[in-house]
From Swiss-Prot:
It is found in: Cell membrane; Cell junction, Tight junction. It comes from Potorous tridactylus (Potoroo). Belongs to the ELL/occludin family. This is Occludin. Residues 45-248 form the MARVEL domain. The modification Phosphotyrosine is found at residues 364, 368. Localized at tight junctions of both epithelial and endothelial cells. PANTHER family: OCCLUDIN (PTHR23288:SF6), OCCLUDIN AND RNA POLYMERASE II ELONGATION FACTOR ELL (PTHR23288). The C-terminal is cytoplasmic and is important for interaction with ZO-1. Necessary for the tight junction localization. Involved in the regulation of the permeability barrier function of the tight junction. Residues 407-434 form a coiled coil. The keyword Transmembrane applies.
Length: 489
């Protein structure tokens, strides 16, 4: 057989190749404190910081280009005007001009070459960084891999190196005092130093003074270009750091635990920590509306017809005792789910069906506890006989300890069934995107049907009813503790 079935964990495609061991749970799971989800769509995340810094580098490159280009007129036209005007000043200044001309094209830094090199490197940095920004903002899978951010780090390091060289060359080219220091004591140095010292003298006329001022002093736009050049070097080095940090997070947490796009907002149940805090408090008014189940999912309109109406926040349904045997058959929603989803892999082809809403999807995939299936009137009476109202602090501590133990068991069951529901949703999405008849499609469909069979198994149904029973028990104990605390206050 051409298709080799791989072990599937539900967090990626069964035929995908992992560069790292897959994590042990779905992204954003409440129970995986050691594997927190990474929200890479946020601007304060490492890839978000990389994009911000790259945008800053693009702006700095534009500023460098504008500032350097604004001084080119002095280099290409000011020199000719100065030498032509100085020809009539006599042999004294002609000697200096000859020395200046020898310096200008001699072994020292040529300001024209420095300007051209700075502009060329700024344009190169602008184009490369802009290309990386556009690629990083795209939703292509290649732009969300460790290999891409390795490319970002390498290119940013190379750009930082060439921009550092260009900035140093530009500083030496536009600041003759920095360049002349290397030739201290030479004839060229003495001649140019004398010209720069007489920069403010009105003897040579206005044209010579203006050009000498430009040559001997650093213009404001040249200073801005120098500062922007070194800032660009620093930002490129920081980009290298955050690109490597992004690669490390992808390797450490795994691609399934990374959100590149903002997840759709879905209705969530109450916070378990707040619930436990309210119960654990010594004094406080307990709100019975806060006794909803931790993993309770909203009811979709399609399945509400199977469920009785609710009254005072508790649904009337078949009561569950502390120990409930496994049911002989699936519940009505399960029967509907069974008839419509579990089918041969070949018949679940690529179809453009509308994606279910968060409410409807969660109802079908994690329907082990719903408000309409638990906390019936008779069930509350059963728990009231087992856990009567609290009359002393000792009984309250006993209730509280039992509440904490049952809560841990309840959370573990919810996590286990949430995991199955998450895998089914991911597999359903993959089946909608794959072409029917492909080997990859067959493998995903087999895993999908296996999980659906698991949901209909007696073991799963037993856990489902145990979760419902634990929820009713926790709600009752919470009311007893809340009533006792309220009576004392």
């Amino acid at each position: 057989m051409m298709y080799e079935k791989r072990s599937y964990t539900g967090y990626g495609h069964p035929s995908s190749h992992y560069d790292y061991p897959p994590p042990s749970g779905p992204p954003g799971s409440f129970y995986l404190a050691d594997v927190p989800p990474q929200h890479f769509y946020q601007w304060r995340s490492p890839p978000g910081i990389v994009r911000i810094l790259q945008g800053s580098v693009v702006i700095l490159c534009l500023v460098i280009f504008a500032c350097v280009a604004s001084t080119l007129a002095w280099e290409y036209y000011g020199s000719g005007g100065l030498l032509g005007y100085g020809g009539g000043l006599g042999s004294y200044y002609n000697g200096y001009y000859g020395g200046y001309n020898g310096y200008y094209y001699g072994g020292l830094t040529n300001p024209r070459a420095a300007n051209g090199f700075m502009i060329a490197m700024a344009v190169l940095c602008f184009l490369v960084t802009l290309g990386l920004v556009i690629a990083g903002l795209s939703k292509a899978s290649g732009a969300r891999s460790r290999r891409f951010y390795l490319l970002v780090a390498v290119l940013s390091g190379l750009l930082a190196f060439v921009m550092l060289i260009a900035s140093i060359v530009y500083v030496v080219g536009v600041n003759p005092r920095a360049g002349l220091g290397a030739s201290s004591g030479s004839l060229y140095y003495n001649q140019m130093l004398m010209l720069c010292n007489q920069m403010m003298s009105p003897v040579a006329g206005g044209i010579m003074n203006q050009y000498l001022y430009h040559y001997c002093m650093v213009d404001p736009q040249e200073a801005v270009a120098i500062v922007c050049g070194f800032l660009t070097v620093i930002l490129l080095c920081v980009i290298c750091y955050f690109a490597q940090k992004t690669r490390h997070k992808i390797w450490k947490y795994g691609k399934p635990n990374i959100f590149w796009d903002k997840p759709l907002a879905t209705a969530e149940g109450p916070n378990v920590e707040e619930w436990v805090k309210n119960v654990s408090g010594d004094v406080g008014t307990q709100d019975e509306t806060a006794t909803l189940a931790y993993s309770e999912k909203p009811i979709s309109p399609l399945t509400s017809a199977f469920l009785p109406a609710q009254e005072n926040g508790y649904g009337h349904s078949t009561p569950s005792s502390p120990s409930v045997p496994p049911p002989e058959g699936p519940s009505p929603p399960e029967e509907k789910d069974k008839g419509s989803v579990s089918r041969p892999p070949a018949r679940r082809g690529h179809r453009q069906r509308p994606r279910p809403t968060g409410l409807e999807e969660s109802q079908y995939e994690t329907d082990y506890t719903t408000a309409a299936e638990s906390s019936g009137e008779q069930n509350r009476d059963d728990w009231a006989s087992l856990y009567p109202p609290i009359i002393s602090d000792a009984i309250r501590q006993t209730y509280k300890a039992e509440f904490n133990n049952d809560l841990q068991r309840y959370k573990a069951l919810c996590a286990e069934m949430d995991d199955i529901g998450t895998q089914l949703r991911q597999l359903s999405h993959e089946l909608d995107c794959l072409p029917e008849g492909s080997l990859r499609y067959q493998g995903v469909a087999e895993e999908y049907n296996r999980l659906k069979d698991l949901k209909r198994s007696p073991e799963y149904q037993s856990k489902k009813l145990e979760t419902q029973s634990l929820r009713d028990k926790l709600c009752h104990i919470k009311r007893m503790v809340g009533g006792y605390d309220q009576s004392r206050s």
